[in-house]
């Protein structure tokens, strides 16, 4: 008991002495010397470190990023090579197309006469080729008609030597009408409407008429006897047939774009390209063919004493109902 009491008293004295001692207690950690490279961290430094944002997670190491780049490099280079090859292929195809187009245009220009190819640009060459083809078409019609005319004339001279002079004068004109009429494709009945086709033809004893309509562009071909084709007739007070026809078409809101005439003996082929204006009341092929047929009928039947276009005994401003009923 005595030993226990002494030990307890000694422990109490030790605690009291340590509590009342002016020098603080130093732990074993405090007593150890600090290394030179260590940095003493203050409370402010700890608070700053705690307030900083944490580093982004899942950040791959540099070695992994390098490996991915090495994997993607061949694929990126392959795509660039394909794009470059495709671009070069397109350039080569376009260059080849332009070269072929220039060759064709140069050949086309060399085949045309000088009046039809006065400029070297593409639009002028193509437009000149169109005009030249139209001129060749009219020349072909004239030559075919002349050929049949000469053949029929030779047959009539060799087969019969006892024909009357009147018959010999009428025969040369009949082959022209037959040979020229073969270029007008379709027969047309004015009492019936051709709703399915885009081409109609009117055939009467005095003329053959063919009309083709493509959207707002109309092509009109007329085979008719010429009136006023001699200088003596042109000098008279009666205007020519062509001027009347042009005036009548313009009065129907058909703007003339191109007009050409091919003649043989006293027959003429009028090839007219016209634009159908918005104010035109003739909306179909049959309407245009009927109106032109009506005009030519009135021109053929009009008296010879008319001295000007204002004195013509008919009105050119025909509407759709008048044209239909007049036929």
Curated annotation (Swiss-Prot):
Q: Where is the composition biased (Basic residues)?
A: 65-76
Where found in the cell?
Nucleus
Q: Which GO terms describe its biological process?
A: regulation of DNA-templated transcription
Tissue-specificity statement: Expressed in leaves, stems, and flowers.
Q: Per its UniProt entry, which superkingdom is the organism in?
A: Eukaryota
- Residues forming the bHLH domain are 85-136
**Record carries keyword Nucleus:** yes
Protein name from the UniProt record:
Transcription factor bHLH71
Residues annotated as region Disordered?
46-88, 151-176
Which Gene Ontology terms of cellular component type are present? Answer: nucleus
Q: Which SMART domains match?
A: HLH
Listed under subunit, the entry gives: Homodimer. Interacts with FAMA.
What PANTHER family does the annotation carry? MAX DIMERIZATION, MAD, TRANSCRIPTION FACTOR BHLH71
Q: What role does this protein play?
A: Transcription factor. May be involved in the differentiation of stomatal guard cells.
What is the predominant subcellular site recorded for this chain?
nucleus
- Record's keyword terms, sorted: Developmental protein, DNA-binding, Nucleus, Transcription, Transcription regulation
Q: Where is the composition biased (Basic and acidic residues)?
A: 77-88
Gene that specifies this protein: BHLH71
Gene Ontology molecular functions: DNA binding; DNA-binding transcription factor activity; protein dimerization activity
Q: Where is the composition biased (Polar residues)?
A: 152-169
Stretch forming the signal peptide: none
């Amino acid at each position: 008991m005595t030993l226990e009491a002494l030990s307890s008293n000694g422990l109490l004295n030790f605690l009291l002495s340590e509590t009342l001692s002016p020098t603080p207690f130093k732990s074993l950690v405090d007593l150890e010397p600090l290394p030179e490279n260590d940095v003493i961290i203050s409370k402010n430094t700890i608070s700053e470190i705690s307030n900083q944002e944490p580093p982004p997670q899942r950040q791959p190491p540099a070695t992994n990023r390098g490996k991915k780049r090495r994997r993607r490099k061949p694929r990126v280079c392959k795509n660039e090579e394909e794009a470059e090859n495709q671009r070069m292929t397109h350039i080569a195809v376009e260059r080849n197309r332009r070269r072929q187009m220039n060759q064709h245009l140069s050949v086309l220009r060399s085949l045309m006469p000088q009046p039809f190819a006065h400029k070297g640009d593409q639009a002028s060459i193509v437009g000149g080729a169109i005009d030249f083809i139209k001129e060749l078409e009219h020349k072909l019609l004239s030559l075919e008609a002349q050929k049949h005319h000469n053949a029929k004339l030779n047959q009539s001279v060799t087969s019969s030597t006892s024909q009357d002079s009147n018959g010999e004068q009428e025969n040369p004109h009949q082959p022209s009408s037959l040979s020229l009429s073969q270029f007008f494709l379709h027969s047309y009945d004015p009492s019936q409407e051709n709703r399915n086709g885009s081409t109609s033809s009117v055939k009467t004893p005095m003329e053959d008429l063919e009309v083709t309509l493509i959207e707002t562009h109309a092509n009109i071909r007329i085979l008719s006897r010429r009136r006023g084709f001699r200088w003596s007739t042109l000098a008279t007070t009666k205007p020519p047939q062509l001027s009347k026809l042009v005036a009548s078409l313009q009065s129907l809101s058909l703007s003339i774009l191109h007009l050409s005439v091919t003649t043989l003996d006293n027959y003429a082929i009028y090839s007219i390209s016209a634009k159908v204006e918005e104010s035109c009341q003739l909306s179909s092929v049959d309407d245009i063919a009927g109106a032109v047929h009506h005009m030519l009928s009135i021109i053929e039947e009009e008296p010879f004493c008319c001295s000007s276009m204002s004195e013509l005994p008919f009105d050119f401003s025909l509407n759709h109902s008048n044209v239909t009923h007049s036929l």
